[in-house]
């Protein structure tokens, strides 16, 4: 399945717009990661634990969106966007959405 953040694909024709599709996941922080993040905030550096957490969350949300698009008969999702929000103390939602289409 083709996933893109642009509205058109050069050389491809959109033959049908199927509508909005989305995927999301809510993740919470790990106490051990919080301790390491606190130290990194003092000394500087990448928060690798959080980087991995967000990479996993993006992948899961994207797979959920693709599954919804396939269920609608799409072979592509265009104009894809990611968003994050805090849903509770220590927990965040990663949300991805786009337009399911049939391309040829």
From Swiss-Prot:
It comes from the Bacteria. It holds the Pfam family YbjQ_1. Belongs to the UPF0145 family. This is UPF0145 protein HCH_01985. The lineage of its organism: Bacteria, Pseudomonadati, Pseudomonadota, Gammaproteobacteria, Oceanospirillales.
